[in-house]
Amino acid sequence: MLTLHRAALVLPDPADPTAPSHPDGAVLVRGELVEAVGAYAGLAAAHPEARVRDWGDALLTPGLRNPYGHWLLERTYHPDPREGVGDEPVPDGLAGERDEARCGASARRGLQRMLGFGVTAVAGPFERAAVRTAVARSGLTVLPGAGAGAGVGAAGDGVGAGVAGPLDPLAVLPLAGALHGRVAVGGRADFAVFAPGAEGVEGHGGDPVGTGGSVGTGGPWVGGCRATVLAGRLVFRRR
């Protein structure tokens, strides 16, 4: 089945300054893979049978990487809403925990929350069997981490898999520094859709992905995550 994801601005490879951007663009997905990227009008005319998901004034980019996976999933406890203790992560809530089922359930809730921020890749290492299973079933790409005791991530960006960090990478990284991979023809269809920030996405000169913005802003034009797609599946959609 073909699905056409339309957005006001599609940035398939923001890390490459020579890569094209597509105002009123679209990504055509067949199964798990990207079949085409380009102008919406042309793709819609060429594939009238495709199902259209129109994300309106949004920005479509590759998904985000979360470099804090080890700490967030192996040490942090993500409460069950039925526990009545709120939904905020509990730092070191799993330290010394021996109940694998509890660890696995916490990891599943944490992963679901990551998807809500546009995360499509997460850094390990994951030492608990229950956590490894949860991550594998989530569909997120697993990245090598810096280790449980390290303080600098594999990307050399000053953050590491073994240190504390947020579920939302954009809380500490600009969008350009948080993106993982690119949206490329023949590649796995992993991407995220973001609402525009205060400046919108029209007239997209300057710095639409935050390469010149301050850490923690996520870039001047980026709002919250509207949707996350993993291997062609819509795994999160903000209501």
Give the residues covered by each predicted segment:
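Active-site loop-helix segments enriched in His/Asp/Glu that coordinate
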Residues: 120-159
